[in-house]
Amino acid sequence: MVPSTFLRSKPARCLPVLLATLIFAGCGTHTQDQSAAFMQGTSQANSSFYLQQMQQSTNDSKTNWQLLAIRALLQEGKKQQAIDLFNQLPANLNSTQAREQSLLAVEVKLAQNDYQAARNLLAKIDPTNLEQPQQARYWQAQIDASQGKPSLTLLRALIAQQPLLSDAKQRQKNIDATWQALTSMPQDQANALVINADENILQGWLDLQRMWFDNRNDPTLLKAGVKDWQTRYPQNPGAKMLPTALVNMQNYKPASINKIALFLPLNGQASIFGRTIQQGFEAAKNGAPSVTGSAVPAQVAQAANVSGNDDVVSPSQAEISDLTATGSRADPVQAPTQDQAAPAAEPAAQAPATSTTPQTTASPATQPVTAPAAQPQPVVATAANPSAELKIYDTTTQPISQLLAQAQQDGATLVVGPLLKENVEEVIKSNTPLNVLALNQPEKVESRANLCYFALSPEDEARDAARHIHQQGKQTPLLLVPRGALGDRVVSAFADEWLKLGGASVLQQRFGSTAELRAGVNGGGGIALSGTPVSTLPSAQNSILGSADEMPVSSGGSVDAAYILATPEQIAYIKPMIAMRNGSQSNVTLYASSRSAQGTAGPDFRLEMEGLQYSEIPMLAGSNPSLMQQALSAVRNDYSLARLYAMGADAWSLANHFTQMRQTPGFELNGNTGDLTANQDCVINRKLSWLKYQQGKIVPAS
């Protein structure tokens, strides 16, 4: 009996040890399985949870939680914490962890806005080796690294990502992004694309793009083309779920312009601007000559060289937004003097300063409008419509809300204006049901289905300059701008656009008055082509022109472009001072806004400005010589007012194409103030003409 008792007691004594071993083994397995499930993307949590699990784990499990925490921190916008944790990853990773680490390395570079490094890392990853959730992230990283620049790489990434998305909103976002890439691609680039024979989905998208290129300015043909495309490519993701922009096109109805209400200031400080815009608007309504072709100059610069322009005063010395900045008149550019302004107002003297009298004043005799050639190009002409009823409402007489109510009661179908920024903001607050083409842009744009924004402003010109300079392959631009609010606005607009284009840091340097610049020339100081990064410079800088030591160049490299915002008098000092400090053979290309353009420029000035590129509205660059002559005659050769005259003419064209601008993606109008397109908020963008001083002449900039 003793042996029997011994045998029974031995298992009994071992049982607690075995149970404990099984329990702990089970716990360890559960933890490992849990981190693996999160790694595979089947579960999600926030960074706090992952960090806590990481602290409580060891070995591979701890590394898994660390990788998950990095991913969550990046998603939560905690960039620096994610980078620090990423740098603490162990060197020895298993294959699963190594794949996740390689993807996180890309996402870290994207968080740092180091897009080139991200693209280099992506090139080393084979997406077929990734798990499906990782593949979706890989393709999103490819999309982000492209920075929205239309390319075959971007299109392929979007197409590859689409089937990996399960959420309907994400799929629609993907379809819309694909369409945005297609419609923002220049037609020459699209025509040069070469794809593989088995890329059926991409082929379908490119066929839709070609149809859109051919019919984008004809809503009826565009709608029919979309339906035909859906029939021919029924399995294309875009046919099953149309891009939002094309869905909106299915409901296209042209806006009526039988009764137009023109909201302008006809009294007070801005009246000269309001009356000049009115003149241009009425001239176009009654058949003024239309612009011929796009803003890209061919021989258009010749108009700027003719001797008949020798008595033209310097252009663009009075920007609209300088005068109409909300709640402030800080640093305004001087308006034309009374003897200059009066003649411009005389032709508009018939216009009543009340809000109730229809305007039927005919414009001066003009050439008939030339119809555009029948080709899939931007609209270049808008037919005259003298029978359209036009009423002028003086925005200085009543609150905007009352004028809008009066216009609606008068039967207006479209409002053009107001001009002042504060009045535009009042329109937004009013929630009017009328279609409104505002002639300025508020600080914060609100997207409304019945509202578009059309402004001539230094900011608008700065954005175009950023695009032009980036297109010329420049990497490190310096902004030479005046102290004060005007300089702040231009710097902000340029830098924002530069970042969108994928550029690195932008440098800036401020200067003072013309008298201070003159003193600098007399002192032999010169201007160093260096500056402080935009993100770190205070909004108001006290020094006139800092030394090279005071203005450190960013780590991105030496300056290769300088954009100058100055009057003709100021740039006459600035350019020689740049040469004085840097030598005339500097490799830095100089650019200027139209504010610097000199209608009275003689041979000496043109030689002094050798190599300088500057922007100009197409009308004053020579794209519409007849209207240019008419406008300059009306405003006594004041170029700044001639710009507003051109703006008025373009406002008429935009009014006639209001619905297309609002609803048709990629719709483009060749205007007197630029090639006009609208973004998704219906902010009208202008592509300007770029000219250059060369051997004493003005020629198109390459």
UniProtKB/Swiss-Prot annotation:
GO terms for cellular component: periplasmic side of cell outer membrane; periplasmic space. CDD domains: PBP1_YraM_LppC_lipoprotein-like. Residues 1-26 form the signal peptide. The keyword Membrane applies. The keyword Lipoprotein applies. It is found in: Cell outer membrane. PANTHER family: PENICILLIN-BINDING PROTEIN ACTIVATOR LPOA (PTHR38038:SF1). It is a lipid-anchor. Residues 327-378 are annotated as: Disordered. The lineage of its organism: Bacteria, Pseudomonadati, Pseudomonadota, Gammaproteobacteria, Enterobacterales. Keywords: Cell outer membrane, Cell shape, Lipoprotein, Membrane, Palmitate, Peptidoglycan synthesis, Signal. InterPro entries: LpoA (IPR007443), Lytic_TGlycosylase_superhlx_U (IPR008939), Peripla_BP_I (IPR028082), TPR-like_helical_dom_sf (IPR011990). Interacts with PBP1a. A lipid is attached at residue 27 (N-palmitoyl cysteine). Residues 330-378 have a biased composition (Low complexity). GO terms for molecular function: enzyme regulator activity; hydrolase activity, hydrolyzing O-glycosyl compounds. Its main location: membrane. Belongs to the LpoA family. Regulator of peptidoglycan synthesis that is essential for the function of penicillin-binding protein 1A (PBP1a). It comes from Klebsiella pneumoniae subsp. pneumoniae (strain ATCC 700721 / MGH 78578). This is Penicillin-binding protein activator LpoA. A lipid is attached at residue 27 (S-diacylglycerol cysteine). GO terms for biological process: peptidoglycan biosynthetic process; regulation of cell shape.
